[in-house]
Regions:
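Hydrophobic, aromatic-enriched alpha-helical segments typical of multi-pass transmembrane helices
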Residues: 1-173
Length: 173
């Protein structure tokens, strides 16, 4: 692993990502059980907003970590945060489908931003593959909720969550 990587900052970012992944998994299960309409409910909107609130601190920690290929993160993460914020606001204010589509679009940048984390940690920990594969599966599975088939996103998020937990454990040694 790059000797200039700030391990504690990476661990802090991973911890925030774990909290987000747990909250996302809970939301994904509810969306599968109650349908996409759940995203328009007050509790669904609050859950999505709380998840969104975790993205700036996670991004801050990752920005300060000296990751390899950090430019990928520094471009993709703010795009993800901004597009998702617009989608959340649009969903909350209009209840229109475009809002959810923007949220899904914003989340397409999440695994792209995660490439910097993956490239930094892959030699140190093969479990980083779980993280990145899970992130891509989760993201690619999100549009399937529009067809009442959210299982790929749930499995992807669970794999990503497992990878994050293993990475934290390995880095904390």
């Amino acid at each position: 692993m790059n000797p200039f990587v700030r391990t504690q900052s990476v661990i802090s970012g991973l911890r925030v990502s774990v909290v987000a992944a747990v909250l996302i998994l809970a939301l994904l299960v509810q969306l599968q059980l109650f349908g996409v309409r759940y995203a328009y409910s007050l509790s669904g909107l609050i859950q999505m907003f709380v998840i969104w609130l975790l993205s700036p601190p996670a991004t801050y920690f990752y920005f300060n970590s000296n990751l390899d290929k950090a430019l990928i993160l520094k471009v993709a993460a703010p795009l993800a945060i901004a597009v998702t914020a617009v989608g959340l606001l649009y969903t909350a204010l209009t209840g229109g489908l475009l809002g959810l589509e923007l949220i899904v679009l914003g989340y397409l940048f999440e695994p792209i931003a995660g490439i910097s984390i993956f490239l930094t940690l892959r030699e140190f920990s093969p479990e980083s593959y779980m993280f990145i594969v899970g992130a891509f599966a989760y993201t690619l599975g999100l549009p399937l909720y529009f067809f009442d088939f959210g299982y790929l996103a749930m499995i992807g998020d669970a794999v990503k969550l497992s990878g994050l937990l293993i990475l934290i454990r390995r880095l904390s040694r």
